[in-house]
């Protein structure tokens, strides 16, 4: 009699995905972030579910319901801060996961990559709507500023914005629908994650050398299960240090002031994980141009497989491309920092230059360097 995990219709799917899955023998810790993202999603859905039990999506009571969760609900404070800082961990893992894909040429699995980019957009949309829910000053003004960007779309822009708002400004209708979508999207994301994995398992994982690893595979369990658990423990440790020692470190103090449409905060800025996109948006003086740059700064990931001109898949043996990759990382860190600064003298020009550099490295330089390396090595 065969083992039930290999014969049962449901268990055999799990078995072929997480237990007997052949995996390359040399994938490094950079490959841990996929499983960490799965755990992050689970943590966010669970904490979010318990928060939703006590939250009210009404402009009059939203702010005080969050206060009530922190003060009166059993362990409500830890639920709230796990959810808020869990989002930060989610984005740290996301950006590392995408960076890993860029570095090691994982984008050559086009279907997996494209679903991944759509997932990135979905998670960003979810995080944005979640930030609006506590109905603090930064929630309200962030929602106003970001939704207002859609008015830059020619002809239908204004109607579109008012349709999203459900009125002539960000108000009760907006908050209610944002709560509905913030609750719904993570489940859609979960379904898309399954599709992401389905496409990945069609090809199998890439590895740091970028060379096919069909001749040297090991079972996922126990080797990578134990490795994933180690990564998970490290991530939980960092998350708990954030939550228990400095839960508000990544938040904005303005969000502890209830939303007031008559009083604009001095510096409207999003959470840290959107600052790079916000800086790129601000660096273009034209409204429509800024919105296009904002969307394209992330949508550019879609065309990365087309720009791949090297004969090698991974950057492991391409020093020139490595330099450009780390230059891009440094550039995005600098853009993130500028996004948090006020619109003043040195920051404006620096932000514009960094945004131009970010786009130029991603489009022109990466492709040119790969081609040059190929030419130099006379392939």
Curated annotation (Swiss-Prot):
It holds the Pfam family Cytochrome_B. It is found in: Mitochondrion inner membrane. Component of the ubiquinol-cytochrome c reductase complex (complex III or cytochrome b-c1 complex) that is part of the mitochondrial respiratory chain. The b-c1 complex mediates electron transfer from ubiquinol to cytochrome c. Contributes to the generation of a proton gradient across the mitochondrial membrane that is then used for ATP synthesis. Heme 1 (or BL or b562) is low-potential and absorbs at about 562 nm, and heme 2 (or BH or b566) is high-potential and absorbs at about 566 nm. The chain crosses the membrane at residues 33-53, 77-98, 113-133, 178-198, 226-246, 288-308, 320-340, 347-367. GO terms for cellular component: mitochondrial inner membrane; respiratory chain complex III. The gene is MT-CYB. A ubiquinone binds at residue 201. PROSITE patterns: CYTB_CTER, CYTB_NTER. It is a multi-pass membrane protein. The keyword Transport applies. Its main location: mitochondrion. This is Cytochrome b. The cytochrome bc1 complex contains 11 subunits: 3 respiratory subunits (MT-CYB, CYC1 and UQCRFS1), 2 core proteins (UQCRC1 and UQCRC2) and 6 low-molecular weight proteins (UQCRH/QCR6, UQCRB/QCR7, UQCRQ/QCR8, UQCR10/QCR9, UQCR11/QCR10 and a cleavage product of UQCRFS1). This cytochrome bc1 complex then forms a dimer. Binds 2 heme b groups non-covalently. InterPro entries: Cyt_b/b6_C (IPR005798), Cyt_b/b6_C_sf (IPR036150), Cyt_b/b6_N (IPR005797), Cytb/b6-like_sf (IPR027387), Cytochrome_b (IPR030689), Cytochrome_b_C_euk/bac (IPR048260), Cytochrome_b_N_euk/bac (IPR048259), Di-haem_cyt_TM (IPR016174).
